[in-house]
Amino acid sequence: MLHGDITSSNDTIGVAVVNYKMPRLHTKAEVLDNARKIADMIVGMKTGLPGMDLVIFPEYSTHGIMYDSKEMYETASTVPGDETEIFAEACRKAKVWGVFSLTGERHEEHPKKAPYNTLILMNDKGEIVQKYRKIMPWVPIEGWYPGNCTYVSEGPKGLKISLIICDDGNYPEIWRDCAMKGAELIVRCQGYMYPAKDQQVIMAKAMAWANNVYVAVANASGFDGVYSYFGHSAIIGFDGRTLGECGEEDYGVQYAQLSKSLIRDARKNGQSQNHLFKLLHRGYTGMINSGDGDRGVAACPYDFYAKWVADPEGTREMVESFTRSTVGTEECPIEGIPNKKVAHR
């Protein structure tokens, strides 16, 4: 893990994250103009960072947030589509991979159902290698249709990459799911606003440490008339230490080199902090000393996960028993979100 240079090597992947200023757009034409602005930025960044293999832009960086529902549906993209072709041309020209946000991607039943909040990983030939749909939309505000799975794809120089989006990252389960599928870099693109800056900085670092994984966070900056976005895009080592972090500045860039051999060596030879290995080899020292084998315990000890898989509706009722039974709350009502239990006749 290296920080401070503009290079990369056969062993290191040069990764850049961008504090992209949150745009406020209303039409398809404006979205495409903004996509061209992102494309120009990619080419310029590659000139200044010749080692850059992967560039990452935040959630909402392409479309902005369409606070008007009609505009949100009208500007929703297809994948591939006009926006992705602009990005593809830039990736080919700069010979770089990219992660790009599409908010939204048209649902298969568009316009009857809400769009998805989507990220794509694109290679340096302009091909879409991974398409991820946000599993945990930021309810009650975000109206995206939820996705249902994570992916791992081989990225530049063979680094294994997973994509997650913003509120996804508040749930340790998604980080573990990606890491246990073999991800070596988890990319978290977000359009996160104040007041949650400190919590999000902590979360990214903690999840890198807990999952022995590189983390790259690209966050929006600026004010869009509704929210103020805190930036702090960052690249974090698999030991949880920050390699580079932006401030709140618009269009700030951070860059670091992520070693393939180093993370693979740590996962193979690390002992006391090899969290992925230890989770499936629980208590092996005590088991060895007790004559009960030399690999520890593999069985899952956490009742919640077994119950959730076996009985999702029953598990939901269990959670509602100590939280609430409606998605909304009467004490802070939000238009369109039910906050009273429906009476049954």
From Swiss-Prot:
Pfam families given in the database record: CN_hydrolase
GO molecular function terms attached to this record: amidase activity
Active-site residues, as the UniProt record annotates them: E59 (proton acceptor), K134 (proton donor), C166 (nucleophile)
Entry EC number(s): 3.5.1.4
Reactions the enzyme catalyzes: a monocarboxylic acid amide + H2O = a monocarboxylate + NH4(+)
Domain CN hydrolase: from-to ranges: 13-260
Keywords: Hydrolase
Protein family: Belongs to the carbon-nitrogen hydrolase superfamily. Aliphatic amidase family.
Primary role: Catalyzes the hydrolysis of short-chain aliphatic amides to their corresponding organic acids with release of ammonia. Also exhibits in vitro acyl transferase activity, transferring the acyl moiety of short-chain amides to hydroxylamine to form hydroxamates.
Protein known as: Aliphatic amidase
High-level lineage: Bacteria, Pseudomonadati, Pseudomonadota, Alphaproteobacteria, Hyphomicrobiales
Gene: amiE
